[in-house]
């Protein structure tokens, strides 16, 4: 059975493809989830993709990842990245290798987006690569946990 990574998307990411396409692009959440599933599969991993507009539900997903011994977490907490100490604390509590992703470059946007609580709980943070940031995050996570791409027998 494949090790599972959780891919967690926060508020408004269900609106990808229609919400501010100049900032977030034209890909929708299903495109992101497909990209994550395919990338994870390349490393013999399974991607369990979740989205919620509610902070508490995202925390429940993090706790579930811990309870199910998930190998890692990729999280785009959306606006909660900049405000949620509770998400930070949940990620720290579970001690699961985590990568933070943002589709847009949060440092080139409004000042309030420049600080991320979730980044402080992650071993890496990617920002500004569009949805390709998810692929990069999974590659980095695979390297961190020692997953190997079976197509070329090389670690990520």
UniProtKB/Swiss-Prot annotation:
<comment type="subunit">
    <text>Homododecamer.</text>
</comment>
<dbReference type="GO" id="GO:0009423">
    <property type="term" value="P:chorismate biosynthetic process"/>
</dbReference>
<protein>
    <recommendedName>
        <fullName>3-dehydroquinate dehydratase</fullName>
        <ecNumber>4.2.1.10</ecNumber>
    </recommendedName>
</protein>
<keyword id="KW-0028">Amino-acid biosynthesis</keyword>
<keyword id="KW-0456">Lyase</keyword>
<comment type="function">
    <text>Catalyzes a trans-dehydration via an enolate intermediate.</text>
</comment>
<dbReference type="GO" id="GO:0003855">
    <property type="term" value="F:3-dehydroquinate dehydratase activity"/>
</dbReference>
<feature type="binding site">
    <location>
        <position position="82"/>
    </location>
    <ligand>
        <name>substrate</name>
    </ligand>
</feature>
<feature type="site" description="Transition state stabilizer">
    <location>
        <position position="19"/>
    </location>
</feature>
<comment type="similarity">
    <text>Belongs to the type-II 3-dehydroquinase family.</text>
</comment>
<dbReference type="GO" id="GO:0008652">
    <property type="term" value="P:amino acid biosynthetic process"/>
</dbReference>
<feature type="binding site">
    <location>
        <position position="76"/>
    </location>
    <ligand>
        <name>substrate</name>
    </ligand>
</feature>
<feature type="binding site">
    <location>
        <position position="113"/>
    </location>
    <ligand>
        <name>substrate</name>
    </ligand>
</feature>
<dbReference type="InterPro" id="IPR018509">
    <property type="entry name" value="DHquinase_II_CS"/>
</dbReference>
<dbReference type="InterPro" id="IPR036441">
    <property type="entry name" value="DHquinase_II_sf"/>
</dbReference>
<dbReference type="InterPro" id="IPR001874">
    <property type="entry name" value="DHquinase_II"/>
</dbReference>
<dbReference type="GO" id="GO:0009073">
    <property type="term" value="P:aromatic amino acid family biosynthetic process"/>
</dbReference>
<feature type="binding site">
    <location>
        <begin position="103"/>
        <end position="104"/>
    </location>
    <ligand>
        <name>substrate</name>
    </ligand>
</feature>
<feature type="active site" description="Proton acceptor">
    <location>
        <position position="24"/>
    </location>
</feature>
<dbReference type="GO" id="GO:0019631">
    <property type="term" value="P:quinate catabolic process"/>
</dbReference>
<dbReference type="Pfam" id="PF01220">
    <property type="entry name" value="DHquinase_II"/>
</dbReference>
<feature type="binding site">
    <location>
        <position position="89"/>
    </location>
    <ligand>
        <name>substrate</name>
    </ligand>
</feature>
<feature type="active site" description="Proton donor">
    <location>
        <position position="102"/>
    </location>
</feature>
<keyword id="KW-0057">Aromatic amino acid biosynthesis</keyword>
<comment type="pathway">
    <text>Metabolic intermediate biosynthesis; chorismate biosynthesis; chorismate from D-erythrose 4-phosphate and phosphoenolpyruvate: step 3/7.</text>
</comment>
């Amino acid at each position: 059975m494949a090790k599972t990574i959780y891919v967690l998307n926060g508020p408004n990411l269900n609106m990808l493809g229609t919400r501010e396409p100049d900032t977030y692009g034209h890909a929708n959440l299903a495109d992101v989830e497909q990209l994550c599933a395919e990338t994870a599969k390349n490393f013999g991993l399974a991607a369990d993709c979740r989205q919620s507009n509610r902070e508490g539900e995202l925390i429940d997903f993090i706790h579930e990842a811990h309870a199910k011994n998930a190998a890692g977490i990729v999280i785009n907490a959306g606006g909660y990245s900049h405000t949620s100490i509770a998400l930070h604390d949940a990620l720290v509590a579970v001690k699961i290798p985590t990568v933070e992703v943002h589709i847009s470059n949060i440092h080139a946007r409004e000042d309030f987006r420049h600080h991320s609580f979730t980044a402080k709980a992650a071993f890496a943070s990617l920002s500004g690569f569009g949805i390709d940031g998810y692929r990069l995050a999974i590659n980095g996570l695979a390297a961190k946990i020692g997953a190997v791409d079976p197509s070329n027998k090389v670690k990520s």
